[in-house]
């Protein structure tokens, strides 16, 4: 798994910026403060395993990675049912935190689960092993569909994308690709904020 992480970094231009980034009430993040019924508030705290970034003079783009000991598949349906909101919450928090820190406009580039594993692969030729391992450890998540951002995350060749949940075609990306545009990613963040507020109100009413 460590080798695969190194390959992820080498294959792109994003660089690891911080590890185990804790955030909570003390950061005064609007996106982590949920206004509930009867004037109550709910604060969310957490720890982001790793954040990679790339930036220019005015903009900063973030890539969030959450390490998992077991395989975790990113599932839009679960998000809309309020069951798998962690990555989106983390991205909301990091975007607001780094806008405050840098004064730049901050955008989501990608959010991923990375399975910590050391797979055993069977290949005919030794030079195929590395690609097979990377494919077996391909991250699950959602990617900003902007081609330049995807290229910054992984420079690909004829072998296709080995680290990202993306399949390229002559006309863009095929339907198996987990991609959204920037507006859709921001909207996903708002949906999760609404779901968190609903969850907070349910907890207040004892509906668990």
Give the ranges of each region predicted by the language model:
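Structural signature of nuclease core domains in nucleic-acid processing machines
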Residues: 1-208
